[in-house]
């Protein structure tokens, strides 16, 4: 009882696109799938501090095209594009085919579930009170135009002997409405008391017209290589 289906999985092909877009023969499918997993694993490890939201992979004509959605494109690109060139070579070695890497900037990280969950987890690791971290995330999301947001944390909250769950919600989060644009993600905070799980649901509004309406929306422009300013950037 009380189990929830994954908000992205139930909406795939309705209002949510796939993170990997390619077709393969039966004998190549497993290799491509394993390659996608290894590429994402490598990029998430290398770009742990770059606020990466999601990684989309396409495989056109015996090559691989990776799009990294990040709130801090300057860190990914590096000085004069040096870092992104290293990533391109590494991805090509992992996938075994020529690689192309595009960088897409996340304009509003406060409305991205993965970045919000990661921010809350990092605050918990820095011993910020969990209620303060949750409330701040909710207020920022609502201020920037979210229709609703729910945040849940589970574990030994505040160092308590018995683990428990607490959640905070503001606005609407209609999980059963398939046309609702629900962004969902999780993160983990590794504290001295143990692991605290963080879940975030963000309702951004309803999408009428399904995938056709999403395809007509203007895509985010790839970020141009430029040097990241010192002492600035989102943490």
Swiss-Prot record:
Region Disordered, residue ranges: 215-235
Example GO molecular function: structural constituent of ribosome
A GO BP annotation: translation
Compositional bias (Low complexity): 215-226
Pfam families membership: KH_2 (PF07650), Ribosomal_S3_C (PF00189)
Gene Ontology annotations for the cellular component aspect, listed alphabetically: cytosolic small ribosomal subunit
KH type-2 domain: residues covered: 39-107
Keywords: Ribonucleoprotein, Ribosomal protein, RNA-binding, rRNA-binding
Record keyword rRNA-binding present: yes
SUPFAM superfamilies assigned: Prokaryotic type KH domain (KH-domain type II), Ribosomal protein S3 C-terminal domain
Record keyword RNA-binding present: yes
Cited function: Binds the lower part of the 30S subunit head. Binds mRNA in the 70S ribosome, positioning it for translation.
Family: Belongs to the universal ribosomal protein uS3 family.
Subunit structure: Part of the 30S ribosomal subunit. Forms a tight complex with proteins S10 and S14.
NCBIfam families: rpsC_bact
Name of protein: Small ribosomal subunit protein uS3
Organism expressing this protein natively: Histophilus somni (strain 129Pt)
């Amino acid at each position: 009882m009380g189990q929830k289906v994954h908000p992205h999985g139930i909406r795939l092909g309705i209002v949510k696109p796939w993170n990997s877009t390619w077709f393969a023969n039966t004998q190549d499918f497993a290799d491509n799938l394993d390659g996608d997993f290894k590429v994402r694993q490598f990029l998430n490890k290398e770009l742990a501090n770059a606020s990466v939201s999601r990684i989309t992979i396409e495989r056109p004509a015996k090559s691989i095209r990776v799009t990294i959605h990040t709130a801090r494109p300057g860190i990914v690109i590096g000085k004069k594009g040096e870092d992104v060139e290293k990533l391109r070579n590494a991805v090509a070695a992992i996938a075994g085919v020529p690689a192309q890497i595009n960088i897409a900037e996340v304009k509003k990280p406060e409305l991205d579930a993965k970045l919000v969950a990661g921010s809350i987890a990092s605050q918990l690791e820095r011993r910020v009170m969990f209620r303060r971290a949750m409330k701040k995330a909710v207020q920022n999301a609502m201020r920037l135009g979210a229709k609703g947001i729910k945040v849940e944390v589970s574990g030994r909250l505040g160092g308590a002997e018995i683990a428990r769950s607490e959640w905070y919600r503001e606005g609407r989060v209609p999980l059963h409405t398939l046309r609702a644009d629900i962004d969902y993600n999780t993160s983990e905070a590794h504290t001295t008391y143990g692991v605290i799980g963080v879940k975030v649901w963000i309702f951004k509004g309803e999408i009428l017209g399904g995938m056709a309406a999403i395809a007509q929306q203007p895509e985010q422009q790839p970020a141009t290589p430029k040097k990241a300013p010192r002492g600035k950037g989102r943490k």
